[in-house]
From Swiss-Prot:
CDD domains tied to this protein: IPMI (cd01583)
InterPro entries to which the protein is assigned, alphabetical: Acnase/IPM_dHydase_lsu_aba_1/3 (IPR015931), Acoase/IPM_deHydtase_lsu_aba (IPR001030), Aconitase_4Fe-4S_BS (IPR018136), Aconitase_4Fe-4S_dom (IPR036008), HAcnase/IPMdehydase_lsu_prok (IPR011826), Homoacnase/IPMdehydase_lsu (IPR006251), IPM_dehydratase_rel_enz (IPR050067), IPMI_cat (IPR033941)
Pathway note: Amino-acid biosynthesis; L-leucine biosynthesis; L-leucine from 3-methyl-2-oxobutanoate: step 2/4
Designated gene of the protein: leuC
Pfam families, per the entry: Aconitase
Name the record gives this protein: 3-isopropylmalate dehydratase large subunit
Catalysed reaction, written as an equation: (2R,3S)-3-isopropylmalate = (2S)-2-isopropylmalate
SUPFAM superfamilies: Aconitase iron-sulfur domain
Cited NCBIfam families: hacA_fam (TIGR01343), IPMI_arch (TIGR02086), LEU2 (TIGR02083), PRK00402.1 (NF001614)
MF GO annotations: 3-isopropylmalate dehydratase activity; 4 iron, 4 sulfur cluster binding; metal ion binding
Length: 421
């Protein structure tokens, strides 16, 4: 039987050939929880009477949403995960001493391996498919079941193959490719499907761009996003202390897809997702014509808080100043990224431009803290969601864009095209 990469990964984990639509129970290689979702899983774990984790080395808790804690409620919530991690002597526990957003720090630490089946109690767990793994978000109760048994059930998803052709223009990145897909198919256009990204454009993308694309697969309703391993993937993995030996799977020629989409990127401009859906994509040229003044610009999150994003922003901000009526917040996705940015002089560039540089956190993205929007404020952001009230007041607006667009807009005080600078 001809199989997709997703079908092959599940076949490997189940021990028999499986195809899309089958209900299976699969071994889980890595379980991911955070300070918001893990306490619920811990409660269910303890309620079950379980005394130990099925696979302690395959469970990671990443404290990233409200860390350092912002108030008493978040402090007490974090305490639950901390005590559980210490009680079970978790090796893969990441807190203030080694901070990072979960979907950035796990690949950085070598905890995501090609061929894995990964689940996380966070919808953007699909990020890790960029490394040729099947990775998806689940609820906290599902997480608890996997903590106890080391397994979980799935319906093997059908796949949509997206083939990118052409050549990217300057300041067009992986973020723009995924926003363009979502613009074309809508927020439910890939419902419970595996979005498989391929083509000559993907072959030339950095890992950071690939992570951005897979991260936002869920915004099209997808169960996962996935990119087959190539030399760029292998180079990324080369110096990592990998948890286990990787397995490389590739879709067969003639494998069955729900649909195959071909996108020519030759004339693609940077894409801006207008409020209040990621599918509301428009060209940056349209946004410039709309003359949209901004109160806040944000660069960070599990979508675009990586080192390449900071380098892009620094190139644009160097020697410039953030507009007087605009705030620019920059949040490196991990401590390692922050330290690398500091060594390269990027942090100095940001501060001299008038930006605020924060510790790694999900805070602003989910409207938790460190960048909440007030009534009727407008923000251009590298994050992944722009729903009503996502980053603050329900009357505020979020425009999603790549790091270059956000940096250029911070200087202009309104949404700007970095190619015009």
């Amino acid at each position: 039987m001809k199989q997709t990469i997703t079908e092959k990964i599940f076949s490997d984990h189940v021990g028999k050939e499986v195809s899309a639509g089958e209900i299976i129970e699969s071994k889980i290689d890595m379980i991911i929880g955070n300070d918001i979702t893990t306490p619920i899983s811990i409660k269910q774990f303890e309620r079950s009477g379980a005394k130990k984790l099925a696979n302690p080395d395959g469970f990671a808790i990443v404290m990233d949403h409200y860390i350092p804690t912002k108030d008493i409620l978040s402090a007490n919530q974090a305490k639950i995960s901390r005590e559980f991690a210490y009680k079970h002597d978790l090796k893969n526990y990441f807190d203030e001493k080694d901070m990072g957003i979960e979907h950035a720090i796990l690949p950085e630490k070598g905890l995501v391996i090609p061929g894995d089946v990964i689940i996380g109690a966070d919808s953007h767990t699909c990020t890790h498919g960029a490394l040729g793994a099947f990775s998806t978000g689940m609820g906290s109760t599902d997480l608890a079941y996997a903590m106890i048994t080391g397994k979980n059930w799935f319906k093997v998803p059908e796949s949509i193959k997206v083939v990118f052709k052409g050549k990217l223009d300057k300041h067009v990145y992986g973020k723009d490719l995924i926003l363009e897909i979502i613009r074309q198919i809508g927020v439910d256009g890939a419902l419970y499907k595996a979005l498989e990204f391929s083509g000559e454009v993907i072959d030339g993308l950095s890992m950071d761009d690939r992570f951005s694309m897979c991260n936002m697969a869920i915004e099209a309703g997808a169960k996962s996003g996935i990119i087959a391993v190539d030399e760029i993937t292998k180079e990324f993995l080369k110096d990592k202390n990998l948890r286990d030996k990787p397995k490389f799977f590739y879709s067969d020629e003639g494998a069955k897809y729900d649909k195959i989409l071909e996108i020519d990127v030759t004339n693609l401009d940077p894409v801006i997702a207008y409020p209040f859906l990621p599918s509301n994509g428009k060209s940056v040229r349209q946004a410039v014509r709309d003359d949209l003044a901004i109160d806040q610009a944000f660069i960070g999150s599990c979508t675009n808080g990586r080192l390449s994003d900071l380098r892009i922003a620094a190139q644009i901000l160097k020697g410039k100043k953030v507009a007087r009526k605009t705030r620019l917040i920059i949040t490196p996705a991990t401590q390692k990224i922050a330290r690398a940015a500091e060594k390269e002089g990027l942090i100095d560039i940001f501060i001299e431009a008038g930006a605020v540089v924060s510790n790694p956190t999900c805070g602003a993205c989910l409207g938790g803290y460190m960048g909440i929007l007030g009534a009727n404020e407008r923000c251009i952001s590298t994050t992944n969601r722009n729903f009503v009230g996502r980053m603050g007041d329900r009357t505020s607006e979020i425009y999603l864009a790549n790091s270059a667009v956000v940096a250029a807009s911070a200087i202009a005080g309104k949404i700007a095209d970095p190619r015009d600078l």
